[in-house]
Structures are given as structure tokens and as C-alpha cells.
Amino acid sequence: MNLLFTIVVTFFAGMGAGLGTGFAGMSAAAVISPMLITFLGMDPYMAVGIALSSDVLASAVSAFTYHKNKNLDIKNGLIMMASVLVFTVVGSWVASRVPSATMGGFSVFMTFLLGIKFIVRPVMTTKEAMQGVSAKKRAIQSIVCGVLIGFICGFIGAGGGMMMLLILTSVLGYELKTAVGTSVFIMTFTALTGAVSHFMIGGAPNWFVWALCVVFTLLWARIAAVFANKADPKTLNRATGIVLVVLGVVIMGFNLLS
């Protein structure tokens, strides 16, 4: 019973996380952590570590899929990533000094709101419009936004993907596919940094649960990324919005349960 229950929980956690990653560049931590904590009674710090490591491969595969379809801004992604990484470490250290109950609620609510935004006000920016911004201005914007995202990411251990998507589409004016592609590209590295630091501070995870989460998240992220790159902008906005709203509601439900 226990084994089957663990597989079922990790399957659905991985499915939610993978779809969120492939469609919206959402951090797997937002879905996997609450499920592992609520149903498997796992230590919150360890659950976030497992979720972040599930994120690494899922984001890498998604980023590769977006890159293959020319929907990835590597240059500005690298600039933003540098500032995100530095401040994720700062945020993570601050978080290890505060009680873990404060984490998570904020990012879940944001996921839900962002989902509604994509359904009600789709991002219809085109690649042509994106070219209109000067390289220097975009680089500076990338650094400033990266600092903000990194600190909040490290502190909450989630919400980074959502914040990145919000900032890339709203502040930096990216077209949706490029925003998601760039977001998952950055997240591959931020999740890796986060996972390694979590395991170094908190010790090794339950390897069985870890392996299941990694495999299931990877599988669903690949499916979602392939679909997202083939879809037209309107359909993609709607699909992304629905995935985010459903995940937001489900996770809020878990938080109430626990």
C-alpha cells in the first residue's frame, strides 16, 4: 500500500510540475513540495530539495525543445541568470534562518492570478515587436529583474518561474513562447544551484521518492513543451492560463489540508 501510494503521489506531483514547467516555465517546487509534505509527511526543506532537483532535467529538456523551435533568448537569459543565481544563494541563506511556514503561500496565489491573467489578457506580443528594444536597455533590465527574482526565489524556494514569466512578458515585453523558453533555460541552472545547496545543508533525500519525481516531471514537461511550441499564441495563452489556474487552486487546497 505504502509503495503504491508513494508512486501515485509522485506521479501526480510530477504531472502537475511537468505541465507547469513545459507550458509556463513554472518551478516544480510549487507543485511537488506541498504534495510531498501533505501526503508523504516529508520535511519541508527536503521536499523543496527534491522538487528543485526534479526541476533541473525537466527545465533542461523544455529549454532544449524551445531552443530547437527558436524560442529562446540565450544572451539576455545568461545575463539575467547570473544575477538570479547570486541572489538565490543570498535568499536561500536568509530563508534557512526563518520558520518554514512562511514559505509557499505567496507563490501559489501568484500562480493562480497569473493563470487568470493569461486567460483574460493574453500576451500577444510578436517577435518583431521584441526586436524594437535596444540591446543595452534589455541587458540592464535583465540584471535588475534578475536580482529581484533571485532573492525571492531563494527565500521562498518557489515562485521563481512564475516571477520570471510575469517579468519577461510584462516588464521586458517578451513574446510568450520566448518568455517561457528563456524562463526554463534560466531555471535549469537556478534549480540546480538550489537543489545542490539544499542537499548540502539538509543531507541526502529519500532516493526512491527523488527518482520518481525526477522521471515523472521530466516526462510531462517534455509532452507540454512539444505541444506549446506547436500551438498558436492564442491557444498557448489559454492552455497556459488553464494549467496555472488549476495548479493554483489544487495547491491552495493542499495548503488548507495541511
Language-model-derived ranges and their functions:
Residues G18, V48-V56, V180-A191, L244:
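Transmembrane helix-bundle signature of multi-pass membrane transporters/permeases
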Residues T126-K127, A158-M163, Y174-T178:
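Short, structured loop/turn "capping" segments at alpha-beta junctions
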Residues S54, T182-H198, F208-A221:
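A small-residue-rich subset of transmembrane alpha-helices
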